[in-house]
Regions:
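Phosphate/dinucleotide-binding and metal-coordinating scaffold of catalytic cores
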Residues: 1-105
Length: 105
């Protein structure tokens, strides 16, 4: 299992988790859920105490990256990631995503 800490506008909001099987999850941390100013990172993943699983998680994080396969392959080559899938690429470049989201190992 591997995980990335997810930040939004500098606030630690949760973890993006990938299991050895390839299954992915996202879970909000307790401090963020209980903050009066907390908002979800996506309307498709509301603030809950349960883990978000499946396509909704994969699609959200995958959409932080370029769609173009060649661009993903260049990122993979430059950073030496195992694959050009979202979790692997975001492990290397997630600190500099578009928008308010950052991912850190």
């Amino acid at each position: 299992m591997a995980d990335l800490f997810v930040f939004m506008n500098g606030h630690d909001v949760g973890k993006y988790i990938q299991h050895r099987s390839g299954a992915q999850e996202f879970v909000y941390n307790d401090l963020w859920q209980n903050a009066e100013y907390a908002i979800p990172i996506s309307l498709s993943m509301p603030l809950t105490e349960t883990k978000h699983k499946g396509d909704v998680v994969y699609n959200f994080f995958d959409n932080l990256l370029p769609d173009n396969k060649e661009t993903r392959q260049r990122i993979q080559s430059k950073f030496g990631t195992k694959t050009n899938q979202a979790f692997d690429l975001l492990t290397s470049i997630g600190q500099d995503c578009v928008g308010a989201i950052q991912l850190l190992p």
